[in-house]
């Protein structure tokens, strides 16, 4: 099961479409997942229903926050510019940080986070979100592994033999290489995930959709600003490489 080049290049768009479809399912199924679970566990007339709802929202917050934490940890070693790049980078094998415990920590974290964000959707939306995103992540994993195997050869085969694919080992399975994590850029690259966790947590306390919407909007705008900054840096780097090649070409033509 392997994603196409189109799926990988436009994975952010596909994830956004799946989220839109999942939350749009409220038009068909009007019952929120948390509400449904509260009714199922304590009943619609129970005096403890608000406490149960807050508990489930707190659990959703923990799922998303844990996912954001693991994604930040992984991005600190992989680099946010690589995480959010449309191109597949397979020239270097990363074997530090969470990559010593699981081969695909970012996808593992995304699946865990989806369990939390899915609780904010309807029952049908939860099924759509968790099912479709998990399938997409598994397809993306398949494509990445195929290219890593092609590029890295025996080194990746050994890495794959020792390190679990998606379910992390509690203990490191390979020695680290001593790479230094870049925490600042990693955190900025996961601002939206952290914002989503904060928004759900705030809603669990206040039960006010406006508070959640404001936090999500601010986090999303900050995330877009960071992506624009990464794109600007990539443009500058391309210009530097282009100018360097032009200088070398002129020097080669000079008698």
Listing of model-derived features with the role each one plays in the protein:
Residues 100-112:
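Conserved SAM-binding loop
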Residues 1-96, 112-255:
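Membrane-anchoring alpha-helices and their flanking helix-loop junctions
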């Amino acid at each position: 099961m392997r994603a196409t080049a189109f799926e990988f290049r436009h994975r952010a768009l596909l994830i956004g479409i799946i989220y839109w479809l999942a939350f749009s399912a409220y038009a068909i199924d009007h019952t929120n997942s948390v509400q449904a679970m509260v009714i199922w566990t304590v009943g619609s007339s129970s005096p403890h229903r608000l406490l149960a709802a807050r508990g489930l929202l707190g659990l959703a917050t923990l799922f998303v926050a844990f996912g954001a934490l693991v994604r930040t940890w992984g991005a600190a070693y992989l680099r946010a510019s690589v995480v959010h790049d449309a191109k597949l980078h397979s020239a270097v094998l990363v074997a530090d940080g969470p990559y010593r415990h699981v081969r695909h920590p970012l996808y593992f974290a995304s699946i865990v986070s989806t369990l939390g964000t899915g609780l904010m959707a309807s029952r049908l939306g939860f099924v759509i979100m968790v099912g479709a995103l998990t399938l997409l992540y598994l397809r993306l994993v398949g494509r990445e592994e195929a290219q890593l195997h092609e590029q890295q050869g025996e080194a990746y085969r050994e890495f794959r033999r020792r390190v679990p694919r998606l379910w992390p080992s509690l203990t490191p399975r390979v020695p680290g290489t001593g790479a230094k994590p870049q925490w600042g850029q990693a955190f900025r690259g996961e601002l939206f995930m952290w914002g989503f966790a904060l928004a759900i947590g705030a809603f669990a306390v206040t039960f006010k959709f406006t508070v959640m919407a404001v936090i999500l909007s601010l986090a999303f705008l900050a995330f877009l600003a960071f992506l624009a900054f990464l794109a600007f840096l990539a443009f500058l780097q391309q210009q530097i490489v282009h100018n360097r090649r032009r200088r070398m070409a002129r020097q080669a033509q000079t008698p």
